[in-house]
């Protein structure tokens, strides 16, 4: 009887519907790609365009050089597209994007960025076509592209009163100026003068690379290593700018001593900057 009758009440069994049911976590719907967002920063379309063009240009140069019969053809086309068609384009896109952080004003976006992309694409196509008119349309488009970037950056630094970056728009203008000299010389057939102007453009591009390096190397190093403090090298940067300008003028005016002094000083300052950035930290 003890085993048959229990005085402890047995709780009723809850229905399955009364139990707590697990629920899937709410997933927010993915945001659809937006053309407006794509055109907010210059690096998005211009990086893609530059990389795509690099692949096409290398393929043409390696596998189909016979097709390069345009007024700007052969080695002149190859050198031009390597420097101004690709490297300078990527640099301009970076400076437009970084300029938004440096000044708090986005220099190039929306319709202005669309115009810049169209000008850049017209130049790439025009320099491939075997017509004199196409060459001049391409040249005008490319020079307007660099002028547009220079003016956009100048507007941002003036409006924000960002004196630290006053030199940037003039670097872009100088890059476009060297491009103009190169293109004009390409039509004259003077190869030595052509390479002289190419070297000026290459030196200006190296100066822009030094500027970018002075900004991003300390920034990312201090973010990666807690407690690391690195100088901004603003003063040496201005001296480096003047030294590179002296070197560029020396190339244009065929003054070897000015080239040696300018580039030598710029190189020494670059070594000083690297050492003060504590590469072994």
Regions found by a protein language model. Give the residues of each.
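Hydrophobic alpha-helical transmembrane segments of multi-pass integral membrane proteins
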Residues: 2-281
